[in-house]
Curated annotation (Swiss-Prot):
Gene: CYB5R3
Modification type N6-acetyllysine: residues: K42, K50, K120
Topological type in the membrane: Lipid-anchor
The protein, known as: NADH-cytochrome b5 reductase 3
Coiled-coil ranges per UniProt: none
Pfam families, per database record: FAD_binding_6, NAD_binding_1
Species whose genome carries this gene: Bos taurus (Bovine)
Length: 301
């Protein structure tokens, strides 16, 4: 009798086990492999393409471990690049312009600070010049994810006050963004995540500051997003030196620009900032305060 029950159990369970195994295999196939499995480990990635965007801006493409790998970077987070340059370890944070929708590669758009071009920084940028000198096939170490903010979708942001604290959830209907120069990359990451989801009705207002019109990083990508999602993405520029027939603002970020081109405080938006520290400290925060945006709803990358 026991043998008969055992046989019967085998007959009954075999199809169930087969179905379970099939589902697990399908699930495993549908879950891509993650490159950044451990934020404390450095992963060497190989340069496979370098595109000249402008006289001082490059798009660097690095291969992930396999064509099926994703980077594994939550929206709002960044990575660190590390390299030994002139005998010293140099580490710099960057936000990719690619996303986890892209398999097999990660893209970084980086402004190269060449030596002897800025009187205050005659040596130029150590990491950006190192990247510029890299040849196809060379590797550099990536580490991450890092950062205090994660965008979880549909207006929900998880923000940690510091690395040791639990995240505080802020849910908003609109997001104000102030970016300066290369500080556009984390903004673009969040904007793309919002715009690609038709069920995410969060409205983004971006005020983007640069020295000149030619310095506007990722302008084609930004304007394409604005044209495709005009109801949800508002874009405004300001430059220090404006050309003739310039349709946007001129000068440093000020109270009037914030009042006119960011969502009003009454909407209780989250305001994100990324740019040179003096811009954040002397232009963004004081003027946001004057307009009425409370500090607890302002976040600097």
């Amino acid at each position: 009798m026991g043998a008969q029950l055992s046989t019967l159990g085998h007959v009954v369970l075999s199809p169930v086990w087969f179905l379970y195994s099939l589902i697990m295999k399908l699930f495993q196939r549908s879950t891509p492999a993650i490159t950044l499995e451990n934020p404390d480990i450095k992963y060497p990635l190989r340069l496979i393409d370098k595109e000249v965007i402008s006289h001082d801006t490059r798009r660097f493409r690095f291969a992930l471990p396999s064509p099926e790998h994703i980077l594994g970077l939550p929206v709002g987070q960044h990575i660190y690049l590390s390299a030994r340059i002139d005998g010293n370890l140099v580490i710099r944070p960057y936000t990719p312009v690619s996303s986890d929708d892209d398999k097999g590669f990660v893209d970084l758009v980086i402004k190269v600070y060449f030596k002897d071009t800025h009187p205050k920084f005659p040596a130029g940028g150590k990491m950006s010049q190192y990247l510029e000198s890299m040849k196809i096939g060379d590797t550099i170490e990536f580490r991450g994810p890092n950062g205090l903010l994660v965008y979880q979708g549909k207006g929900k942001f998880a923000i940690r006050p510091d690395k040791k604290s639990d995240p505080v959830i802020k849910t908003v209907k609109s997001v104000g963004m102030i970016a300066g120069g290369t500080g556009i990359t984390p903004m673009l990451q969040v904007i793309r995540a919002i715009m690609k989801d038709p069920d995410d009705h969060t409205v983004c207002h971006l005020l983007f500051a640069n020295q000149t019109e030619k310095d506007i990083l990722l302008r084609p990508e930004l304007e394409e997003l604005r044209n495709e999602h005009s109801a949800r993405f508002k874009l405004w520029y300001t430059v220090d030196k404006a050309p003739e027939a310039w349709d946007y603002s001129q000068g440093f970020v000020n109270e009037e620009m914030i009042r006119d081109h960011l969502p009003p405080p009454e909407e209780e938006p989250l305001v994100l900032m990324c740019g040179p520290p003096p811009m954040i400290q002397y232009a963004c925060l004081p003027n946001l305060d004057r307009v009425g945006h409370p500090k607890e709803r302002c976040f600097a990358f």
